[in-house]
Amino acid sequence: MGDTAPPQAPAGGLGGASGAGLLGGGSVTPRVHSAIVERLRARIAVCRQHHLSCEGRYERGRAESSDRERESTLQLLSLVQHGQGARKAGKHTKATATAATTTAPPPPPAAPPAASQAAATAAPPPPPDYHHHHQQHLLNSSNNGGSGGINGEQQPPASTPGDQRNSALIALQGSLKRKQVVNLSPANSKRPNGFVDNSFLDIKRIRVGENLSAGQGGLQINNGQSQIMSGTLPMSQAPLRKTNTLPSHTHSPGNGLFNMGLKEVKKEPGETLSCSKHMDGQMTQENIFPNRYGDDPGEQLMDPELQELFNELTNISVPPMSDLELENMINATIKQDDPFNIDLGQQSQRSTPRPSLPMEKIVIKSEYSPGLTQGPSGSPQLRPPSAGPAFSMANSALSTSSPIPSVPQSQAQPQTGSGASRALPSWQEVSHAQQLKQIAANRQQHARMQQHQQQHQPTNWSALPSSAGPSPGPFGQEKIPSPSFGQQTFSPQSSPMPGVAGGSGQSKVMANYMYKAGPSAQGGHLDVLMQQKPQDLSRSFINNPHPAMEPRQGNTKPLFHFNSDQANQQMPSVLPSQNKPSLLHYTQQQQQQQQQQQQQQQQQQQQQQQQQQQQQQQQQQSSISAQQQQQQQSSISAQQQQQQQQQQQQQQQQQQQQQQQQQQQPSSQPAQSLPSQPLLRSPLPLQQKLLLQQMQNQPIAGMGYQVSQQQRQDQHSVVGQNTGPSPSPNPCSNPNTGSGYMNSQQSLLNQQLMGKKQTLQRQIMEQKQQLLLQQQMLADAEKIAPQDQINRHLSRPPPDYKDQRRNVGNMQPTAQYSGGSSTISLNSNQALANPVSTHTILTPNSSLLSTSHGTRMPSLSTAVQNMGMYGNLPCNQPNTYSVTSGMNQLTQQRNPKQLLANQNNPMMPRPPTLGPSNNNNVATFGAGSVGNSQQLRPNLTHSMASMPPQRTSNVMITSNTTAPNWASQEGTSKQQEALTSAGVRFPTGTPAAYTPNQSLQQAVGSQQFSQRAVAPPNQLTPAVQMRPMNQMSQTLNGQTMGPLRGLNLRPNQLSTQILPNLNQSGTGLNQSRTGINQPPSLTPSNFPSPNQSSRAFQGTDHSSDLAFDFLSQQNDNMGPALNSDADFIDSLLKTEPGNDDWMKDINLDEILGNNS
């Protein structure tokens, strides 16, 4: 057991250490590196300790038998003499006997035992007595100046037979023999490194001799060391250093040995100390080492590998690691090394004081010897001993954490010993006053180091990131103390992480945003983290660069601290950097020049964007019906002009800010090249970047949603990448900017519409099909709508009441809707460009929703449009409502095609939804949340928190689009009625915004949507298609239709019936939509297109109908977290018994799985 387990532990420790070392080396920043190294050390120490304990057990049996045969006398003497150390001494003795047995089972080891017996008689430390005596004998010889000779003479002989036997054992037992050899070391507690028992014995003896010479008395020292030694032995890591340190001590007699230990420790980077090579302090030990390792070449190889690993860690010469790698490694290490997490910072602090490492090692090893306070406290701290020395490089940084050593002096000393006080190899020798002085000095050094690190480490890190700048090494980012640096590091690719890691103060905010920007590559969860909490950020990226950094709050805290103001101020410059592809890698180049270039690029991009917008407007207009063209042209042209003006102003402001920030912090900015910058998505088109900058910069300055905006940017950038036709990222950023965004968003939407000409053409074809389907569905819906309405009223009168109010609002704004349709067209363009996939999903959802709702749907779809306004939520929610609704409608029109094209781009699954949802959903969502704040708040809050709500807004928009179509066909009154019963509730959140939007939508709906009616069915079909159409319709009818149940059930069924046709055409859309809707479950559950979108855009469901949305959302996602299980159950319970059929089709596994 022990034998087998120990190898695993050492293998895990060594392998983990080596892997961690490589990874840690990859970490650019010394902090993360130190944290990783410390964790590696801790893990190695734990593995070694475990391995030693197992080996100790295994070898105890063997060693006891062999040692009892050979050294039974020595063991008895050592056990008797060292009463306290009897256990550990027994272990050591057994280990020693085992070492003697394994290394020199023949008399030659016995001869050293004999010598050690003589020494034992001379010196009373028996438990390790064999070791102590042998060591003392060696110490005496070393004091005599013959330590090397004696060690070489005695130990090599011991190791020579040991080598023979070990070679035989290696051949026979292989790793088992290595374990035995290691056990020899572990007997000395240095096995893990594979140190020879003799070397350890020498070390122990040396240490004992040192302690004795130190004046503590051989017995006491032997006792302490017997404890420490035994403790150290289990500490295997410490034994390596200890062995190295002690051998150096052996060279010098008495305190001289002690001083030598310190010197050699200092000389030793700590790397060799941890490794068996530093046994070379005594060539004898090395000889013994090789001899015993001769049997254990693997062990020796392990130690050199560890040395190299630790050297790399200490030198931080390893190539930078990617943030994900560091994050994964650190998280894994944290999970595995949780007990050491606290120690990591301390260890880094402890490890920083190299000179004390010998003592630390001793103390660490003394873990096994609770008798020594050093041991217990030092062991966790010293578990890095093998890696600890490697921290010599990190000592400056570690020293900052050294104040932790100010733990109880007993513990603090082990810690501080590693920091400074432990410089004395014989820690016990240091007087208590001296220890206190050392602790104080360590604290002072720590404070100074923190200051210097904060001041200099950023530059050092900046140097590291600059060297690794393009590389995604997250730690280079840490040097982003300056906001400008953090901002630049915010470049679209990897800068988000750099911002986090980089600036300690400004980089805090920047880091948060940086992470937000960076998540684009890593997915929307980062965006969510961005919005949610700096903690989340720290969890995501910050964990990678700062796990070790975190102990140093000076640099780490700023990153974790989420300062909306700072972030707002910093983000503008960061956004421009994102806009600039050249900013992908911010090296330490002159940032001002870059900013100027960026400004020029932005201006050029703005011009290009304006031109493109005009062209896109023309194209879109040409592709859209005359009415739509006129409305879009009028609204887009005006909006584009406004947006362009705003964008230019914003860009100018941003450029000015960037210049100022860069000028203020040009030194920190070089780190912007932080390797994490590439983490951002592929650079967006300059125009899109400019739009994103403008859109984001405006809202960021005044909005608290900067994080979400950045997230949106990420999403948008994903959308832009995924959807070639539309610069979706720009419109996304526009809605983020707020009401001002609407103009820029509209311009972006125009651009997107231009880019989506082809999708519009496809949609036109689809719309024709959809018109037929819609007509059929409308006929069915008209039939089913009254029943659904009755069912809805019966099942949920309050939501229906609200829905009725909304319907009233919808009916009134019908005239407005046409007026707002131009804005809507812009919004829909925006939605199309940004959330092409999202809106696409929404559009089919709305089609399904309207289909299922029948007449009801038009109102509901209008409400959905208003909900779609959610996207602009962070910015101008009310303004976004009307505009977004129109845009959503346009998006709905385009969405069928875009759905086909963009849905084909599953890449959009979440970011697109987020992007568009951010635009439309946010604003609409905000409005909806205002109106439906009570109902929607739980869900809206979630949706607001999570990107899905934004999607929901898109869904809302889609359904709204469908609603106008239905309204035009069936009549606004029926639509309003249907919405009143089922649809109105859907935009419960936005009664005010919803009403005017609905009126506009209905007016326009009859006009535009009559044409668009076809497209919604296509959209509707994909939405239904998202899941098995029957299952979708039934499930959605039961759940999603919750509020819509009566209408939704039958209309959904009708849609499912019609959808089979649509399914054929829309199957691709559904598939792509499913891909687009990140939660495929959302798509199926989404079944009523509003539900699907709602599920995808949970916010919409919440805004529209929390009640039925619970069902629909939970069918889709089980309300990814927005809808609680209780809500889902409530929706199920509230569902009418007549609609129970949907429950039959519900796939609880899918729902629950999606929800989980």
Swiss-Prot record:
Domain notes: The C-terminal domain is required for transcriptional activation.
Protein encoded by which gene: MAML2
GO molecular function terms attached to this record: transcription coactivator activity
Keywords: Activator, Chromosomal rearrangement, Notch signaling pathway, Nucleus, Phosphoprotein, Transcription, Transcription regulation
Known disease link: A chromosomal aberration involving MAML2 is found in mucoepidermoid carcinomas, benign Warthin tumors and clear cell hidradenomas. Translocation t(11;19)(q21;p13) with CRTC1. The fusion protein consists of the N-terminus of CRTC1 joined to the C-terminus of MAML2. The reciprocal fusion protein consisting of the N-terminus of MAML2 joined to the C-terminus of CRTC1 has been detected in a small number of mucoepidermoid carcinomas.
Subunit structure: Interacts through its N-terminal region with the ankyrin repeat region of the Notch proteins NOTCH1, NOTCH2, NOTCH3 and NOTCH4. Forms a DNA-binding complex with Notch proteins and RBPSUH/RBP-J kappa.
GO-annotated cellular components: nuclear speck; nucleoplasm; nucleus
UniProt superkingdom: Eukaryota
Cellular compartment(s): Nucleus speckle
Protein name: Mastermind-like protein 2
Tissue localization of expression: Widely expressed with high levels detected in placenta, salivary gland and skeletal muscle.
